[in-house]
Amino acid sequence: MDQERHEFSIDWAGRTLSVEVGQLAKQANGAVLVRYGDTAVLSTATASKEPKDLPFFPLTVNYEERLYAAGKIPGGFIKREGRPSERAILTSRLIDRPIRPLFPDGFRNDVQVISIVMSSDQDASPEMAAMIGSSLALCVSDIPFEGPIAGVTVGRINGEFIMNPTPAQLAESDIDLTVAGTKEAINMVEAGAKEVPEDVMLEAILAGHENIKKMIAFQEKVVEVCGKEKREVQLKTFDAELEARLRESAEASIKEAVRIAEKHARQDAIDEIIAAQVEQHSDDDSINVDEVKEILQMFVKEEVRRLITVEKIRPDGRGVDEIRPLSSQIKLLPRTHGSGLFTRGQTQALSVCTLGALGDVQVLDGLGIEETKRFMHHYNFPQFSVGETGPIRAPGRREIGHGALGERALEQVIPSEQEFPYTIRLVSEVLESNGSTSQASICASTLAMMDAGVPIKAPVAGIAMGLVKQGEHMTVLTDIQGMEDALGDMDFKVAGTANGVTALQMDIKISGINREVLEQALEQAKQGRMKILSNMMEAIDKPRAELSEYAPKILTLTINPDKIRDVIGPSGKVINKIIEETGVKIDIEQDGTVYISSLDTAMNQKAKQIIEDLVREVQVGETYHGKVKRIEKFGAFVELFKGKDGLLHISQIAEERINKVEDVFKLGDEVDVRVTEIDNQGRVNLSRKVLLKEQREKLEKEEAKDTANE
């Protein structure tokens, strides 16, 4: 039966946001079309009828960009959208993180949330429209969901917070913050900032939450009218009798095992307990072996959380605000442009910095207005880092997300293109993992850039904070390790310099957190960050003064934009000839800035001289040292510089009359001449006569002066 179409609207951050329900995608469990400005996003939510036999909740969130939304045709031969862009992947994660904690515990039905950008207005964020659409699609559906949630982007210009700023406003802003949450609490934060103090970041988060409350109230009105009755679902529960039996036989030994400080020894002890219990119950056909494993893992989680919240004891024995042992090194790889190794306990990251010409920038093909990217940070997480085997695949969402977080943290201190005309690529290889690998990669990448001689504004370090909340007990943890991340309630990553925050990322597994928790986490993170920066500065306290001998050397010059065509030549013949002669790379900007790069400084200079000669303009009144290239009866043609000749008329060769040019010059002679005129046709007239006259008069004055002195 057709649903009735409903439309709702609200003024949100200075633009109209409207929601349409009941017209599109009616076979989905829930579907809404969100319009924000000229942006239009269709969000749908569907769920399987039966639960899956899995130990986790199978939720998939996809944010899909259609290039027709921006009036573009995809590039390449196939001419259709391929794999999602990095921006689309990051937005999918951005939507997934705040909605995932709001499904019922034990819910195992397959849920898929899809948002398709159908019209893109760069001044009206499609990401925020998709987040609201995803929340509403779930809320109006029959899928169990404890929403709604909403998200907002917060900027700050001249000390004032701006909600959902335009790209132009974000360029001026010192904060680019996305915050999401429910009516009661915040449950997701993602931010980049220009060394902003912690208290300002906190106020920005809270300002965003106030705006979120208005959007949630709007969604609740939509759900009142359009919401379906929630279906009855089968939640996964454990057999009470089996749980009691396992608690009696294994709980005590598990409590001992989780107190083992070393990661692998602790995990081996837990694995042995689980294997013994599985063996003990394997003959009983009424018992599901997988359920035995899940119950025992639940006991591990309970004990770890109890120790942290009640006894303030961490799995490795550290204090709640204690950082694991630190180590920082540089220059491990001699042929790379820069390298840094950062180790924190059993987490280790090796980062390599590579410098390239501006022609090496990444070209972006998406809905965004940004066409290229000069600074890149890539993150790799091989299986050996956790002592396991596994297939080697292309980077997944996690790797892309961690790489982007590091990029956001570091790009705030990258020098401008004018200060440092290089493309910068960082690759972080995680060699050991026991939590906080993304933050270790930030530290290692800072070391690598300083080793490479990149003049960063300040060193950046990152640290991951955790939270475990059990009943009335709550503990904020500094520098969480793998087990604390997996079994805790919050992963709050904070990166920054000694002056302030450059990036934040917060994910939580509970419904939300309040101001007090955020304040405490930010303060502990600041203290931890300062300790880490101190350790890093022992390895290298400032960027190297010179680049690696293996890094390209770049020369910069500026030419008249009207002369760019002279440097490029017809079909690129001129510029290709220069490149062939010198072996350099040449990049020319529309404003006339020319970048010449190669490993050979001499070849850079040669290419620069060729280009300067090509674009050099003759100036009337200037004196040039030229060469006679052609002799005619009426005068000599003199090459002033490559590509530019002038006529030295026979009457302008000498002060006295001469009969033949050949009486004074032969081909190849070098001569000083002055430009006396450039006519309407661009022809250059020269004179040697005026220079000879000036020299004679100067000599006569000096002789007269000498005579007077006698």
Swiss-Prot record:
Coiled coil: none annotated. Its cofactor is Mg(2+). GO terms for molecular function: 3'-5'-RNA exonuclease activity; magnesium ion binding; polyribonucleotide nucleotidyltransferase activity; RNA binding. Its EC number is 2.7.7.8. CDD domains: KH-I_PNPase, RNase_PH_PNPase_1, RNase_PH_PNPase_2, S1_PNPase. Residues 621-689 form the S1 motif domain. It catalyses: RNA(n+1) + phosphate = RNA(n) + a ribonucleoside 5'-diphosphate. The keyword Metal-binding applies. It is found in: Cytoplasm. NCBIfam families: polynuc_phos (TIGR03591), PRK11824.1 (NF008805). This is Polyribonucleotide nucleotidyltransferase.
